[in-house]
Amino acid sequence: MNIQALLSEKVSQALTAAGAPADSEAQIRQSAKAQFGDYQANGVMAVAKKLGMPPRQLAEKVVQLLALEGIAEKTEIAGPGFINIFLDKQWVASQVENALNAPKLGLTPVEPQTIVIDYSAPNVAKEMHVGHLRSTIIGDAAARTLEFLGHNVIRANHVGDWGTQFGMLIAYLEKMQNENASEMDLSDLEAFYREAKKHYDDDADFAERARGYVVKLQGGDEYCRQMWRKLVDITMTQNQINYERLNVTLTKQDVMGESLYNSMLPGIVADLKAKGLAVESEGATVVFLDEYKNKEGEPMGVIIQKKDGGYLYTTTDIACAKYRYETLNADRVLYYIDSRQHQHLMQAWTIVRKAGYVPDSVSLEHHMFGMMLGKDGKPFKTRAGGTIKLSELLDEAYDRALKLIAEKNPQMESDELSALAKVVSIGAIKYADLSKSRTTDYVFDWDNMLAFEGNTAPYMQYAYTRVASIFKRAGIQEDSLTQPITLSDEREFALATRLLQFEETITSVAREGTPHVMCSYLYDLAGLFSGFYEHCPILNAESDDVRQSRLRLALLTAKTLKQGLDTLGIETVEKM
């Protein structure tokens, strides 16, 4: 049930009947205060201006024509022409019944789209670090959300698996006479990488050999390809451990690295030349874009092939967008890449559109995000200024959560303690990020994220456990609750209305790629349940009818909290 969509349709119909253009927007919003009703229609003023009539006069006409019988208890006109809508309690109760009995909490079925989500994208032969965290967990929340709604989601892990570094690594492995690369773990690879780079910088013969291996690798040399595949496999095996620890849904099957598009690059350069979009400039192949200007105010040149014949990231990104439309049949492509890459992506997509590789009907969206900062406001690093490995961050989160939970539950068995610490620690790291607007930088703070108060994962996980425990404590089975829901107390009504706003929330998250909206909703819902729980006795209600009604409200709250947290990739527990 999407109340906002229902009211938008009703108010739009009334606006049209009142003489407004057919495309007039109702602008339905959830009311900030109960005195203004449950929803407000704010579109009357803009429409009245177009029609050249007083807004309040149009609002009165719209209210007369509004068909909200059985949905709204009353409507009121406020100020210059706002329409406040007060929902009918019986109608809200009936919609809660529907949500409880229907699959997926009563969500309206969507028209399924094929949506490609580009996220995580670590580099081969390097261990994942905290810089990969935001893309990985925000992108995964988007994938889970869209999949839950019923879309066909294709996860694309655009790993950095191509380039000169592989020539260096293969050359160094050969130098060390270590062809048994399959037994290396990633920490060895990182050490190899550092040594290979040192040799590359210091030894001209080595550098020449490394460059030769790059050419051989690009030419399909079997020995080089075999070594390259080992490096990729070792890296992705290690990354998979991190993904599973993070409760992220990416698998090895989702890897679509840069190398996937190699065979497309010569054809794309030739095609862009043939279309007159790319030209030779100082030996390189360049696309000049009028949409972007250089410092002299001239069209900016985007290089797609270097003088030496090598290709650039832009060329790969053009091929990648083309592939996602032509081969994956994408209706929508979401890129979870940090904000520093914005201009680069926009330039690639401008070329893609001009070349006709992806039609305007297919949405290409950069869901950019800010940086992860330490308490000092600088990029989050080790005390020595180094990059923090993701595995080390997860280890520290687990240790901190274990200590905290052990202090609160000294009698808890060690196995249970360990399992709970895993769920709480991973939830804390993910929720701390997901609860902030992705477009802003955010400060990483252990104390805040592991707190059991405020908008944190431990608080939300506890909120779910608290609701679920009501049923466990009383030994109540869901199917034993047969009495209808009644909403006689204002707190019952407020909780019920907020429960019905789950679809509006998840629809917004799916449209904008903003999981913090879901976090805010769940935190608000937990707060409303807390007020309801304290003031409306559930197990000790005045009658069995009221008891069952309140238990059913509690049941939908538990289901909504659990499902909402699941779309964020955060697990719940039955006991805390």
Curated annotation (Swiss-Prot):
Chain span(s) of sequence motif 'HIGH' region: 122-132
Primary enzyme class: ligase
Location relative to the cell: Cytoplasm
Listed PROSITE patterns: AA_TRNA_LIGASE_I
InterPro entries found in the cross-reference section: aa-tRNA-synth_I_CS, Arg-tRNA-ligase, Arg-tRNA-synth_N, Arg-tRNA-synth_N_sf, ArgRS_core, DALR_anticod-bd, Rossmann-like_a/b/a_fold, tRNAsynth_Ia_anticodon-bd
Reactions performed catalytically: tRNA(Arg) + L-arginine + ATP = L-arginyl-tRNA(Arg) + AMP + diphosphate
Major place of residence: cytoplasm
One GO-annotated biological process of the protein: arginyl-tRNA aminoacylation
UniProt keyword annotations, A-Z: Aminoacyl-tRNA synthetase, ATP-binding, Cytoplasm, Ligase, Nucleotide-binding, Protein biosynthesis
Record SUPFAM superfamilies: Anticodon-binding domain of a subclass of class I aminoacyl-tRNA synthetases, Arginyl-tRNA synthetase (ArgRS), N-terminal 'additional' domain, Nucleotidylyl transferase
EC number(s) on file: 6.1.1.19
Domain of life: Bacteria
CDD domains to which the protein is assigned, alphabetical: Anticodon_Ia_Arg, ArgRS_core
Annotated GO CC locations: cytoplasm
HAMAP family reported for this sequence: Arg_tRNA_synth (MF_00123)
Self-association state and partner proteins as the record states: Monomer.
Family: Belongs to the class-I aminoacyl-tRNA synthetase family.
Protein name listed in UniProt: Arginine--tRNA ligase
Protein species of origin: Pectobacterium carotovorum subsp. carotovorum (strain PC1)
Gene symbol of the encoding locus: argS
